């Protein structure tokens, strides 16, 4: 039975067509952001029947996502439907034996790949096109998946989707159906007129690519506005209090949220919740906003289109993914996309308006999947250098040059050798290299892995907070270092572990309790609305 207050969504013609095309088969579903792909996935997995009522899945259903926030969101959505659903990420799990499970791709690859009698939905599959280390995790998990397990890959639109279908068929040795749609539930309008002043920004998500830019633009936009009415400010502070946010950022009191990777989870939840309650009407953020987080807005405004990281304009695919956040059925029947004129936050030597005009004319780029070598497997001697290079070359899209991959692997292994000489004494190097292979964690860079391996080599069972101190300089904040060590601890092989994990968990709870209690806090926020 549906939970009280939950109404089954209505289907659109393209969704019914997709369900028919994908019925009983593995498939790739490519459709724009905000088009309603999730409804198709629920039907495909038998979580909904044709009338939109709860279905009866014949197998366990697993949903994977590239980031924890999306697993949390999918879990909460399925809970609202009244389903028995669990969640498992590297640092949190709840009801993980449930018939429906939401997890990160890393957890699927580590724990669930190879199991039978499941249906697998891979959400935001396009994420792997721009992240080689994560692409390897995705493809390792998919290659380990039992051939009888049905797969549904959900993705935003991209160029030459048929190449991805053929790639998956070649790598996974099974047939796939490709269903592409350009349909959107709401109309998307690309404006020819820019926004010229922060005072003109309303009902919008504003994109930039740096924390400093986000903070500056949020402040400037807030300064152009009156403070919110007292009752709205009180409500924002009440939400913040429930989430444990002691000081509400000044821009929120004028209806402007800010969103970037250095925020604590509770700070992100405050912005997301206040925006969905329409207490805020603007969120200024990095492209973290584009990763499926549910923030319905009428406008998407680009205040930057050339990233500092690449020192180049963003891709058409990335542009469309962010633009697709505009519009939401039932709130904004049309979504509008534009740019901020003469943006002072644009990468120097670039003009936002010129890039915007060029992106509108540019075709979508073909999907590219570049796999990274598995140095853990190489160090454990589970494969030869040649076999690993051949796998990486053949299973990338387009295929990489074999000798180029060989040179890349040899270069990294030489670096391992030279760094080992600096990190440990000669009599420990064989032991150290063995440990490095055994505790290697794909989430971490080479030097981070080597420092952690040294800790195990010298201390046997090191204290978790000692490992946190090693990683902290590489992370945006201490919480991220704490959570990474928690995920590493969960992934360590038998015979390895950290002392003081209870101390680490206690510190995580003191820094941000919503890591473990997000569902309870959100329920409390919802209940507090009725008073």
Label each PLM-derived region with a short phrase.
Residues 1-30:
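Conserved pre-motif I regulatory segment
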Residues 27, 92, 143, 150-152, ...:
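Conserved interdomain linker/interface between the two RecA-like ATPase lobes of SF2 helicase motors
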Residues 32, 51-89, 200, 205-282, ...:
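Conserved C-terminal RecA-like helicase domain
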Residues 72-113, 180-185, 190:
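Inter-Walker segment of RecA-like/P-loop motor cores
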Residues 102, 117-122, 280-307, 334-340:
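A short beta-strand element within the Helicase C-terminal
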Residues 105-152:
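SF2 helicase catalytic motif II
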Residues 148-150, 295, 299-355:
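Conserved segment of the helicase C-terminal RecA-like domain
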Residues 277, 367-531:
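Non-catalytic terminal extensions of ATP-dependent helicases
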